[in-house]
């Protein structure tokens, strides 16, 4: 509904192929940065950021320029060692190792109920206020893929 009200087109990460470049768009905002694990990190909510949709505008708008530096530049980077199964590599992510861990009791408690340990290890994520039920919902959706 919003898209028709402001003369735009709604797009979602799952639309495609071709898939919209959400990752690149996020970085271009100057509010999201590439973390040491290649996940997006947001200046306010850390690694808990997720992009569920976007609006493609049919008119030009001015976007404020954000010259902030990545919060990772001054961080001790706890995300790099937080994964209990070392699923994050320099250039890849082992989703099967992650899902296997989530199927055992320890993994269910540590990550399924409380959120991805890597994401929650980010100091900025600790202050984001995400509701535990929202975290559980997204972890269940991840396991269904």
Predicted features along the sequence, with ranges:
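Non-ligating segments of multi-cofactor redox enzymes
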Residues: 1-145
